[in-house]
Amino acid sequence: MNNSEQLIALKESETAFLKYFNKADYELVDFSVVEKLDWKQLNHEDLQQMGERNFWQHEHQIYALRNDFTDQLLRYYSMYPTAATKVAYTGLIIRNNEAAVQVGLENYAPSLANVQQSLKLFIQFIQQQLRDNVHFVVLGHYQLLDALLDKSLQTPDILSMIEERNLSGLFTYLSTEHPIVQILKENTQQQLNVLEHYIPNDHPALVELKIWERWLRTQGYKDIHLDITAQPPRSYYTGLFIQCHFAENESRVLTGGYYKGSIEGFGLGLTL
């Protein structure tokens, strides 16, 4: 496929996504790739992200190129509330001077049924339009770390070792018998079963993970992995996250996650 054909295919995929979810009664939204920011309203995490963003000042006003749709929509709807409970978008994101096209959905005040229906529709779109299918699924939950590791041990060094799955380092800092070490020693397909030995059965994170695992299996997905190593990209990501990896295009990953800041939601996104 030459450059012209790739460009046409990309634009057709964007248009098809909007048509597909418009037909499914999602509200379509179109926001400028240039965000107008107020320094007084930016928090510590916003400022940390400026390292990967392109931004500039003009007449005492700060502007930045969009680097995250969920973050942009959350910021906008916090100031201008919407009655929409589910929205669909397409457009550019720019991170570290690299531009990419992303398509995605946001469910606001989400119910489990609505989020799972959104995921089903998203995967159906990928099957029909992109001619691809889910190869395996990764589940995780951002409350697991607090359930498995005392706050006093959540130092930058230890968190980095967990994220890198550095077992030799964790042996030294935590001990070979620590729950995190014991879980990481297992195959990721078995870790959800092992997790049950280290946190109470009624822990909200474990309950939610088991609900999702059962539902995914009813949808025909058998290759399900647990990730206890991921750190939330923003503090408002406080719940379950999911990654759907595909069979044909291994570089594409459908990602989703629950968040609760000034707005509660569950987002799903795919970079084309």
PLM ranges: what are they?
Residues 1-272:
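TRNA-recognition modules of translation machinery and tRNA-sensing kinases, especially anticodon-binding
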